[in-house]
Amino acid sequence: MFVKQKSGGKKLEEKNNQENIENQEQNQEEVREEKPLTEQEKDELIKKLQEEVETLKQKLQKTEEAAKRLSALYQSIQKDFEDYKIRAIKEREQIKEESIEKFAKAFLDVVDNFEKALESFKVSNDINAIMQGIRMTHYQIMNLLQSYGIEKIEAAGEFNPMEHEALETLKTKEYRNNQIVKVLQAGYKYKGKVIRPAKVVVAISEEEEIT
């Protein structure tokens, strides 16, 4: 029984070897059967490769052209933005100059009236006339400021730290605690914004002081 198994294994090995030999012979035969390319086949292959190269060149050219267009567009936008900034600066300067010019023209009327009042002071001893000229000049100045959005801060009643600045305090029984007693310097607002607080004296009781 053992001898028969060994004989069968040997036959299998011989069969495998034979198949390997046949495969090798077949491969060699296929190699021998391969023929070199003909001139026509070579030309066709070269033509195909050239067409592929030309296609790639065209794609590259289109990409480069698109990049140039984007670069030109970017430069154009950048130039437009720089021009806009220059125009904006010039426009702001022009608006500023026009505002100053407008204010100056309006203020010249006040100056003219003030100079007339000064001339009248030289030739007149009428105190009432002098005071009337001063009041008129002051009235014109306040109207001019108001026309430009500048208004005087109301400095009466209770002290408001948002609009008033306490330079002094006064212990008194005539005013309630934290009431404005006196205005030392008028305050002003421009379009609702405090540009200078009113400097005031504030009343305090004996127990409390303004801080």
From Swiss-Prot:
Domain of life the protein comes from: Bacteria
Assembly notes: Homodimer.
Biological role: Participates actively in the response to hyperosmotic and heat shock by preventing the aggregation of stress-denatured proteins, in association with DnaK and GrpE. It is the nucleotide exchange factor for DnaK and may function as a thermosensor. Unfolded proteins bind initially to DnaJ; upon interaction with the DnaJ-bound protein, DnaK hydrolyzes its bound ATP, resulting in the formation of a stable complex. GrpE releases ADP from DnaK; ATP binding to DnaK triggers the release of the substrate protein, thus completing the reaction cycle.
GO biological process: protein folding
Protein name per Swiss-Prot or TrEMBL: Protein GrpE
GO molecular function, one term: unfolded protein binding
InterPro entries assigned: GrpE, GrpE_coiled_coil, GrpE_head
Compartments reported by the entry: Cytoplasm
Pfam families: GrpE (PF01025)
Region feature (Disordered): 1-43
Entry-linked PROSITE patterns: GRPE
Alphabetical list of Gene3D superfamilies matching this protein: 3.90.20.20, Head domain of nucleotide exchange factor GrpE
GO cellular component: cytoplasm
Residue ranges with Basic and acidic residues bias: 29-43
Family to which this protein belongs: Belongs to the GrpE family.
Keywords: Chaperone, Cytoplasm, Stress response
